[in-house]
Amino acid sequence: MLLHLHPDNPQPRLLKQIADCLKDGGIIIYPTDTIYGLGCDIHHQKAVERICKIKNVDPQKAQLSFICRDLSHLSDYTKSIDTPLYRMLKTYLPGPYTFILPASKQVPKILKNKKETIGLRIPDNIICQQILDTLDNPILSASLPGDMVEEYTDPEIIFEKFGDTVDLVIDGGTGGMNPSTVIDCTTDEWKIIRQGIAEWEA
């Protein structure tokens, strides 16, 4: 199903429909502040397994990421954040960044790789924020399978290609083509491990 959401003022009825789908273990394709992503409620193991199968990745080897609604929410899923790291995160979030951090016990086991790290995002996107508010759980954030092509910016074409694979495709307008910038914060020396759409300085 393709749902058309207003990018600046998402319809509450549709937000509830999306949250209900996620609570039931559904998989969605949704807009972010970068590219369209595959998502599910992180606490639904079968849904996470389904996304890993679509992506053809082993969750124990892959660096999986999920989105949170704010820094307070994010801090539940990582081990203690010291003051310098907190200040840096506060400077750059919400925004088009994924921060690799040590995973806390709150992170479902299936999402932890052998290093016990997790990628965390807070997208600067109203639809994302309001889905998270309605669901009240983080959402897995994975890129669409295959090569990133220009067609992946158009939700109508995304629906044609993936509509039979997922439960909902959310049309929030034209998406981007560049992914988030990924920063590894698991040591005292933070470093970029993937340069994406946004610049970053420690």
Language-model segments: what does each one mean?
Residues M1-A202:
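Active-site-adjacent structural elements in enzyme catalytic cores
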